[in-house]
Amino acid sequence: MSNCFDTNILSSSHINFLFGAGVNGKAFPQLKSFTDTLSKIEELGGNIESGLESGIDSLSSSAHKKIVKDVFIKEFMEADAKMNEKFGKDMSLINLEKMLRKTYLLVNESQNRNPSMKQINIFTLNYDQIVEKTLSSLGYFFSEISASNTTTRAMLLDVIGYNFNVKKYVPTFMVSKLHGDIDNPIIPGKSKYQEMLNEDYFEIAFNMKEKLCRQNSILIVIGYSGRDEHINKILKDCLNAGLTIYWYKFAQMDIVPFEENTQIIVRQQEDYSNPQDTTANCYRDMEQVWEKKLEE
């Protein structure tokens, strides 16, 4: 499979990522694995035949949804605690680390005179702190914002690090948790679209749209199902404003909204019968770009 990145474009763009649950590979359980939450939905009269999200929607009582939310948070935190044992060992997490490290190197070495291009935005739909822990272990400068800290951290949305010793801006990651975090989550279910309109969440979503609509912006999509109506609306608006999207597919049946749009470059798997982590595929594509830069 040929590299989907153009070397010149990648080295002269605002680089942004959109991460869904699939970015963690097999390192973190998917919603279908939250058996305690699924059992509680059934116990309260919900229907889980179509999965956890539809099961939550099938609950008519807000009190029941609150009970399910509490069970979900407890189960999530238990899974998150086990995650700490996997750092440095799980191949999916290693692939994520390699991809973020290569992104840093590319941005650091790019000869962009625009300081804003030193900011790397990661918009994530996940509650976990895998990205933050990975960036911290790499020693990279980053900020994180979610609905639980918007009031105190909104001022960091445009912060970019500067090294006074060498008088140079340094790559800075901005992690925006679009569905909140485990302290203040938007739990799965159609009601999340209404919650996204709340002030705290709206500010994060608005910032995403603003960043993606900038000139010379690209978005690398990894692990996203393509089924979030609110996110898809943002992507559509940004495509109309000139955004280029690089979409990494894991499974052949993965949904890519607006796939007919020529501004969406879909990175297929080399072998769908043996799919590789999309973070690994992205890393390899970036590695090829890096090698070309070294040859220049």
Segments predicted by a language model, with ranges:
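Metal-dependent phosphodiesterase/nuclease catalytic metal-binding core
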Residues: 196
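Conserved catalytic-core helix/loop/strand module for nucleotide-ribose chemistry
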Residues: 1-193, 201-206, 211, 218, ...
